[in-house]
Amino acid sequence: MNNHTSFTSSWIESFILKGKIEDNFSFITKTFTVILCSLILVLSAKIKVDLYPVPMTLQPLAILMISMLCGRNIAVATVSLYLFQGMIGLPVFAYGGGLPYLMGPTGGFLFGFLVASLIIGELADRGWGKVLFKSVFAMMLGMLIIYLFGIVQLSMIKGFEFAILKGMQPFIIGDFYKLILASILLPQIWKLTKISK
């Protein structure tokens, strides 16, 4: 039996392969996709509302969409590249870059992006992006992971109460709307490309 029956292609693979029975697409295509998605993450970091110490950005929405559309491997590679760029000092984060930034108050959210992309991307590879309630659950789980990592690191620096008041409460409503927007967009993208089963 073909192993392809256990897993389904991500949207990006299905879109590029046009329904062909293949396990992977080319290394060059994957690399280009990862670079493009990392640029989207950079841009989403720069669209922000200045709050202290955690800015409100479009990055959670970008993480949700990239992970659900591209699957685990590309999503994890994208976030890894993004974090590496920031770690070596490139100004890709909301307020710059550098290793101290990752170790600072907002670093936990950035590390949460990596774990969230792994979990959401894995579920997307299993076809969850094609089913509304499954995609919503996957993205809610991803959001919770981002909050968990962010709150833990922020509380270690500023205290738990501060972390909840400044690192969680101001973002709940906005992230809820981002989740709703992603949930609306995903099925439409599958339908528009005519690859939804």
Language model features: what each stretch is:
Residues 45-52, 70, 89, 94, ...:
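Short helix-capping/hinge motifs at transmembrane helix termini and TM-loop junctions
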Residues 2-76:
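Hydrophobic transmembrane alpha-helices
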Residues 73-74, 107, 134, 162:
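Residue-level recognition of membrane-helix boundary sites in multi-pass small-molecule transporters
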Residues 45-55, 83-116:
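Interfacial aromatic-anchored transmembrane helix boundaries in multi-pass membrane proteins
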Residues 55-60, 97-105, 162-171:
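Non-cytosolic membrane-interface motifs at loop->transmembrane helix junctions
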Residues 33-44, 63, 67, 78-86, ...:
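Alpha-helical transmembrane segments in multi-pass membrane proteins
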Residues 129-197:
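Membrane-embedded alpha-helical hairpins and interfacial helices in multi-pass inner-membrane proteins
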Residues 3-22, 29, 43, 99-148:
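Short helix-perturbing small/polar motifs within transmembrane alpha-helices
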